[in-house]
A protein has these predicted regions:
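N-terminal glycine-rich FAD/FM-binding segment characteristic of electron-transfer flavoproteins
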Residues: 1-222
């Protein structure tokens, strides 16, 4: 029995959300009295995950996973969870993770709760608080399946460093050839995306016209 957490990366580097889900998953592992295993895909410097509580890192290096494919990623994470006898799987709530999580749940025959905002209220039964109705209300949900999947809401737990040193090992999932082929990917690299932004500032008719939008755009560089 263990807790497994998927740590999302981009161009080999971990996102802040990866460290947050590791911090959160470590707290759950401590409550359960078990270990925390992180799984990374084509990421570098996985020792960073130990700083936030990972005891072990399963490193997946696979060219076929260079571009996100929900089914392939779900299969890889599901196989990693099964190899560790994980009873709790923690994911972030990025766009990719939201797309992939239901597929992982199907693979593992697991209950899945998204937009989680706190540690489990109780372990037996497993009850957890999450936001609903576009964050206008909260719900306390009980997961009854043997394997439980948690989607941690962004900035719901924060970063918590520990003194752990993660042990890394290679993991090679068995993947089928994807039906989808990515020809090219174009990304805006000079600005912070809305998904990664700490604060979002909106503006409207008070700015009169597009010639005044510069003052708002400048705030994104502060």
């Amino acid at each position: 029995m263990s807790v497994l957490v998927y740590t999302e990366s981009e161009n080999g580097s971990f996102k802040k959300t990866a460290f947050e889900v590791v911090s959160y998953a470590k707290a759950i592992a401590t409550e359960l009295g078990t270990t925390l295993t992180a799984v990374s895909i084509n990421a570098s410097n996985t020792s960073q995950l130990g700083v936030y509580g990972a005891d072990k890192v399963l490193e997946i290096t696979n060219d076929s996973l260079a571009n996100f494919d929900s089914q392939a990623y779900a299969d890889a994470i599901s196989q990693a969870a099964a190899s560790q006898d994980a009873t709790v799987v923690v994911l972030s709530q990025t766009a990719n993770a939201k797309f992939m999580a239901p597929l992982v749940a199907v693979n593992l025959e697991a209950g899945y709760v998204s937009n989680v905002v706190a540690l489990p209220q109780s372990i037996t039964p497993f009850k957890i608080k999450h936001s609903v109705y576009t964050n206008k209300a909260f719900s306390l949900t009980q997961i009854n399946t043997p394997v439980k999947i948690i989607g941690l809401g962004k900035n719901a737990y924060g970063l918590h460093e520990t003194s752990a040193a993660a042990v890394s090992e290679a993991f090679s999932p068995s993947l089928q050839q994807s039906d989808t082929k990515v020809i090219s990917v174009d990304k805006a690299t000079d600005k912070v995306t809305i998904a990664d932004a700490e604060v979002v500032v909106s503006a409207g008719r008070g700015l009169k016209g597009p010639e005044n939008w510069g003052m708002i755009e400048e705030m994104a560089t502060i």
